[in-house]
Structures are given as structure tokens and as C-alpha cells.
Amino acid sequence: MAIPLVLVLAWLLPVVLAASLTQVNNFGDNPGSLQMYIYVPNKLASKPAIIVAMHPCGGSATEYYGMYDYHSPADQYGYILIYPSATRDYNCFDAYSSASLTHNGGSDSLSIVNMVKYVISTYGADSSKVYMTGSSSGAIMTNVLAGAYPDVFAAGSAFSGMPYACLYGAGAADPIMSNQTCSQGQIQHTGQQWAAYVHNGYPGYTGQYPRLQMWHGTADNVISYADLGQEISQWTTIMGLSFTGNQTNTPLSGYTKMVYGDGSKFQAYSAAGVGHFVPTDVSVVLDWFGITSGTTTTTTPTTTPTTSTSPSSTGGCTAAHWAQCGGIGYSGCTACASPYTCQKANDYYSQCL
């Protein structure tokens, strides 16, 4: 029986396999002993962007790849995904050692930067379009990379994290053995103090810091919601931004988007009643990175800042400019240094402005 010519030709055509998550064993110096996985779509953009996606404690690159679908949009927009995988301290990333917190100091942060350099070199990726995101430990690492390697990353989106250097000296990264004062929201500094930590991570750096987007649930019992306020204080001080106003029920009902400046450099999301794992809205993250929108747009708040009277605080202490001064669960200074007043962003966070 003769085989139809069309079937013969079809059999001879090359089979195009779907892209998949692939481990890279030799990406360069790896002081953090991390594993590297990448997703490279079959059709890359010209000078593709890079997104580094970092898992929570106890997780892995493969698990985080399956949790949030960044790979389907990668097929459409042609960007490359890097999934680092931690191997120590209950698979938590090192956000506590001076090595990881310091530019070119070593440990996990340098391993991740070397992964980025490998992808830029191997695939011709755009070094000006390197982004990062993560949940819990991955969100903490997003803050670490923003402080230690601001010249590598253009933007970041952190879900349930804490400020840069909040875990400094904790002794370990895992949630069981490490010092719990930061995760319980007990470490509170002024914006200037938090900013000093960042500047110490990369002495002499005078360039721009990554655009940052922070997400946190008000019912988080693993990493205190108070840490969102400290993140806000740290990065708005670094960027010199003031609170502009809120957008309620954005992007979901019960979520409040807190806008700083014109909204193009820093924004924070408060998720009412949400616990430790704030669901990741991939479309919002990609828009923030400028991958789907093509540019970073400014936003106009639907509410304006509410100025509240600064009450006297215990011990007569005063909060400095940019510092937190109120909110549910907050126990620090509630009076602001003159001439600033305590302005309410939402029920959980007020700031001296």
C-alpha cells in the first residue's frame, strides 16, 4: 500500500516541542549553592527581558513555576524566566548575612546576579530590562536584591516580604530557627535609618533604585503586616516620595493600592483579611514591569491623603519625616517631628508627611 505523499512530508517536518523549565548546572560562580532553572520560550523577543521569580521558604524553583503562570505570557511576549532554587535553611534564601546584603559580597544574592549575567550573555537579553518577583522568602530576597544590586534590576514586585536588612544578623533564614523579631514586626526604624542600611549595602552608589511594588495581607500571621509599613518607610525615603492617596478595591475587592509620588516608582497593596500568601496577579506584575503595557504609566489616586492630629505618644517620642506614626497593631511613636503631621493611608498604616 502506497503511503500518501502528504503524510511522508508531514513526517519529515521537524517537531516543534513546547518550551519547558530546564535546569542550568554551570552558570558561573555560585557562592550560595543555589540551583538555577530557566524557561526560554521558543520565540524570543529581540533583546528579551528577564524576570527572576523566587519561591517561598520550603519551596523550590519547580514548585514556584507551577504556582504562578508567568510562562504562558512569556510565550506571547518573549521574555526569559529565571527560577533560583534555595538549598539551605529549609530552602529559604539568605537575607540575613552581610555577604548576601552587600554588593558583590557573595552568598545567595550574588548567585542570583550571576544567573542574570549568564542569561544576558547566552541569550542576548536586555540588561536594562531585568525584573524580580517573589513570595515570602522570595519577596524578602527581592528587597535584598533591590538594595545590594540596584544597578542590575529595573523593577521588583514583592509579595509578603520585609525591608532590606530586617533579618540582618538573625543567624539563619528559616522561619523556625532564626530570630523572629523582624517577622513579628518588632523591628521598627525611621525611614532615614532604613535608608542607611540600603546605602551601606552598596557604598558609593548614586544611581537609581529599582521601581518597587509591595503586597501584604492584613491577616498575615507569618510575616507581620507591620513589616509592610517598614518597607514603605524604607523605600519611599530612598526614592524621596510622599504619599499621594489610595485607590480602593484595586485590583480586587478589599485591596487598597497606596500610591506614592505619581505611582511610577513605588506603590504598595494592602489586602484586607488576606493571610500570608497574597495571591499573585501576574497581569498586574507584568504591567508594573512594563512588559505588557510597554511603558510605566502614572496613576491617579481616587482618594486624597487624610491628615490626622498627631496625639502625644508614650514617653514623648516623635517619629521622623517619612516614618510610620500609626495604624492597627502599631506601637511606636505617634507624634511627628515638627513640621510634619501624621497622615492616614489606611487603617493599618499612617506616615509622617
From Swiss-Prot:
Glycans are attached at residues 179, 246. This is Feruloyl esterase B. Induction: Repressed by glucose, probably via the carbon catabolite repressor protein CreA. It catalyses: feruloyl-polysaccharide + H2O = ferulate + polysaccharide. The gene is FAEB. Glycosylated. SUPFAM superfamilies: alpha/beta-Hydrolases (SSF53474). It is found in: Secreted.
